[in-house]
Amino acid sequence: MGLIPKLLAGLVLLTLCVENGSGQYWSYGVRPGGKRNIEPLVDSFQEMAKEIDQLAEPQHFECTLHQPRSPLRDLKGALESLMEEETGQKKI
């Protein structure tokens, strides 16, 4: 086996070992053997549930800009009501 394939195989093995070894430290509350301490997890789930409940409450925003009624809006409403009356009369 040449020098380049040996170096490449060594680099691949080193990369895999470093990647697998560093993954254990990023886990939350992992003890040896893969066991977890449940108490901190329950607390964090309760905190997340409270945050979700707060986000689920509707927020009411008030518009501070006063916009006068548009005559086109009034005309549109009048035309819609006329069309509804005509279609209602034709159905009878």
From Swiss-Prot:
One of its GO terms (molecular function) is gonadotropin hormone-releasing hormone activity. The modification Glycine amide is found at residue 33. Its main location: secreted. One of its GO terms (biological process) is regulation of gene expression. GO terms for cellular component: extracellular space. Residues 1-23 form the signal peptide. Keywords: Amidation, Cleavage on pair of basic residues, Hormone, Pyrrolidone carboxylic acid, Secreted, Signal. It comes from the Eukaryota. The record marks 26 as: Appears to be essential for biological activity. It is found in: Secreted. The modification Pyrrolidone carboxylic acid is found at residue 24. The record marks 26-31, 33-34 as: Cleavage. Belongs to the GnRH family. Stimulates the secretion of gonadotropins; it stimulates the secretion of both luteinizing and follicle-stimulating hormones. This is Progonadoliberin-1. It comes from Cavia porcellus (Guinea pig). The lineage of its organism: Eukaryota, Metazoa, Chordata, Craniata, Vertebrata.
